[in-house]
Amino acid sequence: MLKKTITYTDYNGMERTEDFYFHLSKAELMEMEMSTTGGMEAYVEKIVNAQDAPAIVQTFKELILKAYGEKSLDGKRFEKSPEKADAFAQTEAYSELF
C-alpha cells in the first residue's frame, strides 16, 4: 500500500493537506497481467517506447483510479469502488497527483 500526502486547494479556496491511499492486491495485479496481451509490463514498455502519449496518459489514469481506496477503520480491508474512485477523480488532489 502506498500512502501519498497531497496538498491541494479545494473548490472553496481552502488549502488542504490530506493522506490518500493506493493499493493493488496480488489478485488485481495478476488480473491486469493476464488480461493484457503480452502482459502489462510489455504493454507499458511498448507504449513508452512508441511515445504514445494518449495511451500513456490513459494507462496512468486507469492505474491511479484502480489503486485508489480507503482503509477500513479496523485496518482489515482496503475499500474500493467505482464511486470512491470517481469521487477522488473529482478532487484537486487527483489533479495534483496526475
Give the ranges of each region predicted by the language model.
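Short, charged/polar N-terminal "headpieces" of proteins
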Residues: 1-43
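Acidic, low-complexity intrinsically disordered segments
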Residues: 41-98
